[in-house]
Amino acid sequence: FGPGSVLSDVKTIAALKGNAANGKTAAAHCTICHKIGAAGVSFGPQLTNWGQARSIEEIVKEIMEPNAKLAHGFDKPVRLRKGTNIAEGMLSNFSWHAGSLKIKLFGGEVKKILFRRKGVKVEELKNHSWMPTPSRMGLSNQDVRDIAEYLKNL
């Protein structure tokens, strides 16, 4: 990501006038982990129709505060460690009896991990979203508002 930015609060950003065409361009940041139409990767929730039933303020809030409300099915972020190797992603299947789990990695690939192997540590991350904040992505207030406008009108 680029240099961080300082953003206003949700209400201030939601009150800006949004531009869906600019939002489509700014949403390229989102397609690193999300599908929007045919573009993007299936790591995070599908965003194609996601914004239609939400207010602009709700969309802005979800973008600004990704840890506040995790989407169903995306609420099991995990980190696996073995020595200096680390795998991070979303828990997709777990079998204590078999000693294995499936983790959805960034990019959408699913890997089976045998966690009972010596030295493998599984850390479940509570109330954690892999989605970075818009300030960490270097987005401006207007970028966030434009993305919200774009998602609302898909």
Question: What name fits each language-model region?
Answer:
Residues E124-P132:
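Small-residue transmembrane helix packing/gating motifs
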Residues F1-A26, F43-P45, R54-K61, R81-I86, ...:
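Electrostatic cytochrome c docking/interface patches
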Residues G40-E65, K76-L125:
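Gly/Gly-Pro-rich "capping" loops immediately C-terminal to redox-active cysteine motifs
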Residues K69-F74:
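Active-site phosphate-binding and catalytic loops of NTP-dependent enzymes
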Residues G23, A27-G37, L47, I147-L151:
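The canonical Cys-X-X-Cys-His
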Residues F1-D9, M64, A87-G89, F94-G99, ...:
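C-terminal capping alpha-helices of c-type cytochrome domains
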Residues G18, G37-F43, A68, L154:
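Inter-heme linker and motif-flanking segments adjacent to c-type heme-binding CXXCH motifs
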